[in-house]
């Protein structure tokens, strides 16, 4: 077997005929500037070919159902294994996906609860047991000898009526006695008259026995008779003791509620046998939200407090106004009082209606009449219209005033009451999955099973323990299994898939990972690296596209790709061990690793402009009533270990809260008391890593508005004027402008069924969407348009953020998250600054080489120099050391986090003993 992977002549994207040898069964890091060609070599060449060869070994029938990779543009690759890629793009956004389902731990939990779970009555909470006749007989025979017992068949349990037919029926079956409401009656002699409106209990006396050896046969017959008469129930009355009730079904003898036999599907929120019927297993329901109906409670009703009422409904001749007039007379309020100052009762009536009919005086066409009208309230009105309408437009309009709320029936647990009434170790499956992963492992280890249950559950428990341990090892101990997969960051989702792969214990596989350290604090890096080594030691080859210094120092082999980005990259600058990279003169990475180059500390830390934005009483997720101050006019970093509450504080509370206050957005922020100081800013901009567009038609030129100016420019040319072309003629989205043969895509897709689809340039337009301009890189276009200031300024900002290598027409679907974020940053930089803007960024260093981080720091400093405020969630210490102010959260992740450990300059944080960030930051200052 070859001990090397040999790549010859790779020309994918910007790779310049790259040939490379890398050792097998080692941990290999691919590094280099953003856009240098790392992903093109790792994912689009090596992974694509490994995956393609594996899929080609399957039958043509099977290949139709599998995603077929394109054959990469490479002469040959030798020594390949089947390849598995773990990137950040494939996080499931399905609201039904949770951490538990993605890792498959939930499947094992369903099996555990179905096999050793203890069912309880969903109504009264009593334990429900299912027993055979033999088990019931054995329990009775354990009573002290000579015990006097009565076998009763409980036919009526707590039901009103005279029950004459029931008593007649007992008599017909040959039974002489019955116990009615605790009293024994002789059915042949006593005249029994029961009161109709009182609940009664009626039990037929099947047998009276003294417990002794040799009565088993008689006892079995009596119990079987009782079970038949009472539909699976038997009551044993022991003289001098409480009655014992036995059931041969899973049914509560007291409430009469029966549950199905326990099966794994009963615990699945995706199965009709397990999911809550009210919310369909989602755990949340879309409900009309009062905060969206009345977004600004400082306004009066006349001033537009109720956003669903337009101006026309406030005119005095309108029906709504006449109804309000009747309400004003009844409750004594006026339409000019701010909504928040109206009495609670009035607010309630306006939203949920008036139970009593109102006398409404209404004039139309000079005819005045008095109507008896019941006012249903705005929320009830919207809810009714939403339920009744068949119009998608109307539904979409009303949905603007709806938000996701926990389902009132299952309280967010997603399952039926019967499934939630089953416990293992005293916890139901939802309570178990809601704990942090580290607590789940402790809980599983602490359960005391009976000998029988121990044998049944041992294999299942082993699988659950190993999978939970892997998640803890990749630094995800703070997550819970009930967490929705769509709410995970790219790094978290990737590490979850990494843990799943370790759990599979495969060997001889080629794993290709894309920056697994994203979102991970330095403290947890060691655990991630040891996990990667564990995967290598089993006998796998790992290629990791990574910029993290610790990972590079621990790697067996490093490949540095460059020297620049885009057209200036695509070559192997250096490859070898850490020492070989550090001693290579051409390697930019080597210079940063030796310290010859570094991100410089700022000359001084800004104090800010004296104003602050303060979040008070933040309590969302794991935040423990936090009050955080953010100085305006500074570069502020929010730091802390993974899961400490950074994203919750900044994205869920600060951004959404300010967005609602300043921009009147409909975002629903997390729980907090108040935000102060917002009057000092006029814009809030969140620059995240979501795609700038989801179709090949969107690109950096359309997003930044450069394309509009270019089209305008084309329409000003002499030839265009002669032909009467307007800017729209140069759009690839508009008929008349676009090529109709390919609908403006520039390429035509030919489906090949079990082979991968082929894309060919359109023969009519030769793939030129608008001349050759869109095919230029930003760098080339900047030179081409240098005399046109409006275009030049926009392109210059793209250059400044390090995106000179991307083509203007490069589809947004081909851009990485980091590139999309920097295009947004460039777009913001190209706007005229007001000096009062708040920018929020979540890990902007994702996908960035240390050299790119250096460039990014300068751009952010430029924004702050213009008087703006930048708040960044960050783990990268080269970035953190350049901050003016730091808010450090912790001390741990999950329940053990959610408090502010320290605030102040990087130097102050480094001196704080409790701060993990400070501990690692020290050596960077």
What are these regions (language model features)?
Residues 1-925:
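Conserved phosphate-binding elements of NTP-dependent enzyme cores
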């Amino acid at each position: 077997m070859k001990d090397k992977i040999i790549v010859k002549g790779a020309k994918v994207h910007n790779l310049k005929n790259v040939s490379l040898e890398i050792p097998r069964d080692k941990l290999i890091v691919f590094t280099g500037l953003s856009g240098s060609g790392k992903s093109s070599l790792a994912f689009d060449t090596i992974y694509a070919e490994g995956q393609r060869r594996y899929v080609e070994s399957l039958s043509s029938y099977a290949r139709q159902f599998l995603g077929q990779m394109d054959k990469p543009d490479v002469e040959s690759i030798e020594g390949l294994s089947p390849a598995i890629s773990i990137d950040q793009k494939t996080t499931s956004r399905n609201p039904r996906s949770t951490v538990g389902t993605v890792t498959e731990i939930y499947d094992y939990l369903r099996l555990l609860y179905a096999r050793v779970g203890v069912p309880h009555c969903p109504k009264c909470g009593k334990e429900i047991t299912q027993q055979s006749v033999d088990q019931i007989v054995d329990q009775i025979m354990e009573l002290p000898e000579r015990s006097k017992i009565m076998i009763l068949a409980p036919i009526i349990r707590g039901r009103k009526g005279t029950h004459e037919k029931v008593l007649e029926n007992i008599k017909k079956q040959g039974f002489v006695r019955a116990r009615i409401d605790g009293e024994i009656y002789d059915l042949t002699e006593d005249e029994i008259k029961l009161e109709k409106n009182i609940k009664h209990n009626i039990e037929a006396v099947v047998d009276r026995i003294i417990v002794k050896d040799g009565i088993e046969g008689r006892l079995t017959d009596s119990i079987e008779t009782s079970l038949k008469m009472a539909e699976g129930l038997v009551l044993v009355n022991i003289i001098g003791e409480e009655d014992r009730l036995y059931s041969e079904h899973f049914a509560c003898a007291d409430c009469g509620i029966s549950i199905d036999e326990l099966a794994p599907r009963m615990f699945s929120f995706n199965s009709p046998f397990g999911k809550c019927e009210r919310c369909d297993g989602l755990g949340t329901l879309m409900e009309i939200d009062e905060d969206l109906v009345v977004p600004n409670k400082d306004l009066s009703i006349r001033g537009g407090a109720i956003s669903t009422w337009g101006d026309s409904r406030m005119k005095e001749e309108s029906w709504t106004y006449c109804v309000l007039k009747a309400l004003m007379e009844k409750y004594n309020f006026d339409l000019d009082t701010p909504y928040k100052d109206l009495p609670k009762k009035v607010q309630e009536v306006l939203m949920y209606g008036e139970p009593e009919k109102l006398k409404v005086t209404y004039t139309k066409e000079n005819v005045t009449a008095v109507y008896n009208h019941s006012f249903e309230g705005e929320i009830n009105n919207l809810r009714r219209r939403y339920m009744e309408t068949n119009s998608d437009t109307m539904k979409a309009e009303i949905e603007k005033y709806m938000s996701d709320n926990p389902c009132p029936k299952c309280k967010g647990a997603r399952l039926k009451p019967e499934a939630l009434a089953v416990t293992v170790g005293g916890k139901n499956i939802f309570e178990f999955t809601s704990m942090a992963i580290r607590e789940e492992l402790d809980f599983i280890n602490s359960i005391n099973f009976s000998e029988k249950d121990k044998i049944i559950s041992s294999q299942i428990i082993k699988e659950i323990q190993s999978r939970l341990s892997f998640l803890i090892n990749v630094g995800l101990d703070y997550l819970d299994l009930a967490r929705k997969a769509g709410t995970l960051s790219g790094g978290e989702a990737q590490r979850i898939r990494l843990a799943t792969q370790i759990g599979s214990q495969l060997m001889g596989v080629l794993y290709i990972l894309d920056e697994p350290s994203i979102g991970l604090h330095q403290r947890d890096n060691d655990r991630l690296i040891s996990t990667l080594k564990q995967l290598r030691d089993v006998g796998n080859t790992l290629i990791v596209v990574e910029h993290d210094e610790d990972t590079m120092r621990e790697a067996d082999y490093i490949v540095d790709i460059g020297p620049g980005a885009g057209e200036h990259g695509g070559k192997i600058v250096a490859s070898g061990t850490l020492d070989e990279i550090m001693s290579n003169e051409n390697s930019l990475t080597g210079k940063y690793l030796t310290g010859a180059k570094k991100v410089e500390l700022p000359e001084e830390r800004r104090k800010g402009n004296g104003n602050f934005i303060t979040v008070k009483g933040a309590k969302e997720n794991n935040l423990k009533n936090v009050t955080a101050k953010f100085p305006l006019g500074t570069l502020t970093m929010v730091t802390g270990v993974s899961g400490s509450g950074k994203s919750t504080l900044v994205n869920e509370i600060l951004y959404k809260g300010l967005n609602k206050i300043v921009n009147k957005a409909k975002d629903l922020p997390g729980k907090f008391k108040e935000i102060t100081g917002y009057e000092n800013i006029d814009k809030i901009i969140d620059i995240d890593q979501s795609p700038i567009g989801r179709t090949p038609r969107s690109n950096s030129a359309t997003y930044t508005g450069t394309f509009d100016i270019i089209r305008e420019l084309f329409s000003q040319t002499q030839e265009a004027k002669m032909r009467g072309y307007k800017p729209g003629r140069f759009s690839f989205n508009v008929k008349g402008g676009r090529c109709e043969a390919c609908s403006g895509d520039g390429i035509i897709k030919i489906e090949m069924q079990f082979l991968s689809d082929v894309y060919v340039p359109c023969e009519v337009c030769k793939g030129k969407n608008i001349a050759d301009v869109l095919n230029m890189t930003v760098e080339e276009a900047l030179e081409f348009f240098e005399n046109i200031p409006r275009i030049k300024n926009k392109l210059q900002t793209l250059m400044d953020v390090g995106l000179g290598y991307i083509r203007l027409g490069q589809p947004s679907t081909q851009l990485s998250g980091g590139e999309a974020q920097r295009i947004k940053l460039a777009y913001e930089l190209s706007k005229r600054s007001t000096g009062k803007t708040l920018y929020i960024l979540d890990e902007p260093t994702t996908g960035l080489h240390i050299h790119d981080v250096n460039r990014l720091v300068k751009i952010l400093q430029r924004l702050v120099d213009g008087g703006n405020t930048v708040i960044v969630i960050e783990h990268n210490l080269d970035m953190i050391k350049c901050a003016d102010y730091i808010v450090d959260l912790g001390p741990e992740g999950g329940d053990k986090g959610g408090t502010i450990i320290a605030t102040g300059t990087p130097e102050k944080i480094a001196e704080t003993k409790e701060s993990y960030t400070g501990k690692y930051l020290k050596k960077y200052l």
